[in-house]
Amino acid sequence: MRASILPLTLFLATLAGAQLSGPVGPLVDYSTKARNQTCNIIDYGAVADGKTDISQALLDAWGNCSVGGLVYIPPGNYSLAEDIELKHGQSSAIQLDGVVMRGHRGSYQMILIRDCNDFEFFSGNSRGAIQGFGYEYLQNDTYGERLLRIQEVNNFSVHGFALIDSPSYYIVFDTVTSGEVYNILIRGVTSVGATDAIDVWGENMWFHDIEVSNGDECVTVKSPAHNYLIENIYCNLSGGTAIGSLGTGTNISDIHYRNLYMNQADACFLKSNNGDGIVKNIIWENVIVHGGPYPLAIDEAWGDDRGSVGVQVSNLTFRNWHGESVSASRPVIRLQCDSDVPCYDITIENVNLWANDSNYVVWQCENAYGDGACLSSAEGTKDLETFTSKQTITATPSYAAPTMAADFTFNLPSTSPFTIPPMPTSFYPGATPISTLLHLHGAGGLPSASPISHHRRHQ
């Protein structure tokens, strides 16, 4: 959100993100791009009947407006019958005010946006959506294409629309820099794995005000990743906010999670198995948990053995956590670090986690050094001994863990299409979204006669 029309707000927002390394978001605001050049897909042959393929219309509109302009998808239902790639954009935007629906069976992703700088993908009326009809695959234990991939894109934002019922993953942010992702709703089948909502690797990223209901991870950090602020995240029946899985060459640092609300989801699951590299300088604070299976977990024996020396994990802080796991049969705090490279400099502060079905909980630490819970203290960071510590806690902690009115208490269906719900107005108890939803009328919010519209001639 770095557009020139809001310099003071953006400056203050940047200061608020202590883990960010610099400004994020597009360099030029969407209204300026729309005023410069607008390409309405209707003028390129698109029909809002939910049946006619818009792939060529969208490609042609992008071809004319990918440098300095705005592609406009007006209200209505549109069928996308081919996977498309929109690439080489410079100071451009896509305004999604309608619903783009999967109209084919692809294998990669419906929309790939690649190699762009100063880019914005947003809904001007906060009613835009990408509809994947994923249940058609998932009910048969098969998978289809991802909905959206943002690849090698710098100085950008994605905001204000819904991604519904993906046949696979929802959004992948691949090798991205200085981006802001916010006011996003992701909803689909909640009983099937390999349906990650947001996977991201890159530099200097701000994610905020996002709600996810799916069958796998919610907002997941992959390697390499540096300088992220992830806040006001509502995982509403989901795997939760994870790091990993991590292989060889891992390089993750300076990630700040805050204001996480987990309904039947895990707030921290860091996972690897004999990879290598580093994970350091990570903060999780202000976390509310209602019913996750592993609410606070490091598992360095997870998944396939990568055959290396282990990922070095250090300087992690868990602060102000409240709530309960789904069952006392699993530890509410489980820090299982690699015996060859123990974790160190871990702080657990004011973490109050209980269990729904019990009068006790378990803390379990393996090869994890620091302060709090079952951690072992250490004077230095070299030659750390291996150990296992398991503690049973019977004193019920005193805490307040409010709930959200929209919490799901049942799995969402896998045999019927999803309706597109309105955009949420809250993503964490008591917190107002950082950016208000847009309510624009027309391309860029400009009067209909203002933009220079480029039309394709039909013969």
Curated annotation (Swiss-Prot):
Database matches in InterPro entries: Glyco_hydro_28, Pectin_lyas_fold, Pectin_lyase_fold/virulence
One of the GO biological process terms: polysaccharide catabolic process
Signal sequence annotation: 1-18
Catalytic residues as annotated in Swiss-Prot or TrEMBL: 216 (proton donor), 290
Key words, A-Z: Carbohydrate metabolism, Cell wall biogenesis/degradation, Disulfide bond, Glycoprotein, Glycosidase, Hydrolase, Polysaccharide degradation, Secreted, Signal
UniProt EC number: 3.2.1.-
Disulfide bond annotation, renumbered to this chain: 39-65, 218-235, 337-343, 365-374
GO molecular function, one term: polygalacturonase activity
Gene Ontology CC annotations of this record: extracellular region
Compartments where located: Secreted
PANTHER family found in the cross-reference section: PECTIN LYASE SUPERFAMILY PROTEIN-RELATED, PTHR31736
Family: Belongs to the glycosyl hydrolase 28 family.
Protein function: Pectinolytic enzymes consist of four classes of enzymes: pectine lyase, polygalacturonase, pectin methylesterase and rhamnogalacturonase. Hydrolyzes alpha-D-galacturonopyranosyl-(1,2)-alpha-L-rhamnopyranosyl linkages in the backbone of the hairy regions of pectins.
Record's protein name: Probable rhamnogalacturonase C
